[in-house]
Amino acid sequence: MKLSVGLKVANSLSLTPQLQQAIRLLQLSSLELEQEIQIQLDSNPLLEKVEEETHESPENVKQEQQEYELSDSLNANHLPDELPVDTDWDDVYTHQSTAMERPEFEDREDNRHSEASLKEHMLGQVNLLHFSPVDKLIAYCIVDALDEKGFLAADIEEIVSSVQHLLQQMDYDIEVEEDEVLVVLKHIQRLEPIGIGARSLAECLFVQIEALATTTLFRKEALMLLKHYELLVSNDLNKLIKQTGLNAELLKSAIDLLKTLKPYPGAEFEQKESDYQIPDVMVSKKNDHWYVQLNPDILPKLRINSFYSGMIKRADQSDDNQYLRNQMLEAKNFIKSVDERHKTLLKVASCIVQHQREFLEIGAEGMKPLVLRDVAEEVELHESTVSRVTTNKFLLTPRGLFELKYFFSSHVGTTSGGEASSTAIRAKIKKLVADENPRKPLSDNTIANLLKEEGIDVARRTVAKYRESLHIPSSSDRKVLI
């Protein structure tokens, strides 16, 4: 690590609880956020939820709106000198109902008590490690980059970039190098489940074998096999015997040991896909203009509880008074983090809609090429932030409900020098096949030529790849003989 401001800065660096909370809230789905809000409501008497009232005066409505909107300007590091008058302590806290307790959610009780996710499980272990603040920040970014199978979905350079971005947010001029990330990654890979954070199946299996006791039978032979991973997956036993010097019996025993490992260590944390999703953002068309808004049904209206805040005595240093002051700071931090989450979500969703208006007008064929970097640069956020805010967040459109990540697709060149979206090309292939003569189905080469006539230059093998991803059989299998 290169320090331009000295070792003292690195030693004093701390990943503030507020920043940790803001990062975590960004990646929560709407249901997970609802659960988190309820946990905060149950544990902090200074935080309360504004309940909807059927008959409210305009003055009351305006006051409630101001209380939520002003949360962005709350200074979490300072309490006003003049607080309301002192009041007797009352430890009774009335539980506020949540959207999850409405009748329409009664059948979804399991969602409120689901097992910890993979990332939550890993963060719990990371917080127990004696990492330096910078290493802990690196670990958070590594965990954030895990996919559902437990593999590291980002390369080391991307992790470094994410860490640098967060350090800059905290105004620290510290340069993190790839070697440091690799060291932290090795620690992560040896947490439970072992092999988590691997960059390939070979590395995943290697970490698990290496973690076994040295007295484990055939451990040494299994490690030898993994050094010839390509021969192993191709099941070329003769070459394996020649390369490793193992006889057939030892080879079989080593392979049997490898079969006891977990190829996808994060799979046990995968949650079954729900048959419903709640939209986070909605888009609608009015007077030839598209409007984006957050789903009002899931927007939490939070505020500071005036009753308990009125008990805080400015000059009182008692434990009870200090407890209330701390709880007020935590409540303000939480309100601000939730508010920032929604502002970021709306900003990113609006940018995506701006790029994909043609999709809204004509469907998948109108999808434009768009990648995380495009949106990140436009809204002036880091790619990792855009990734967090588009994962498990859903946009309700006139054409259906879509995860925000659905609107990202790779670029494919066109004959005119422009670019087309891979999603749009898949849609065109699907339409061509749907309209083909079943007695003379279109070959991949014919489809490629038809796309070229539309200005989309794709190879036959690319068409085959897209066709297979759509689960469309080959032309010979589609042919109908009558």
Curated annotation (Swiss-Prot):
Belongs to the sigma-54 factor family. This is RNA polymerase sigma-54 factor. Pfam families: Sigma54_AID (PF00309), Sigma54_CBD (PF04963), Sigma54_DBD (PF04552). Residues 50-69 are annotated as: Disordered. Residues 55-65 have a biased composition (Basic and acidic residues). One of its GO terms (molecular function) is nucleotidyltransferase activity. Sigma factors are initiation factors that promote the attachment of RNA polymerase to specific initiation sites and are then released. GO terms for biological process: DNA-templated transcription initiation. Residues 371-390 bind DNA. Keywords: DNA-binding, DNA-directed RNA polymerase, Nucleotidyltransferase, Sigma factor, Transcription, Transcription regulation, Transferase. The keyword Protease does not apply. NCBIfam families: PRK05932.1-2 (NF004595), PRK12469.1 (NF009118), rpoN_sigma (TIGR02395). Signal peptide: none annotated. The gene is rpoN. InterPro entries: RNA_pol_sigma_54, RNA_pol_sigma_54_core-bd, RNA_pol_sigma_54_DNA-bd, RpoN_core-bd_sf.
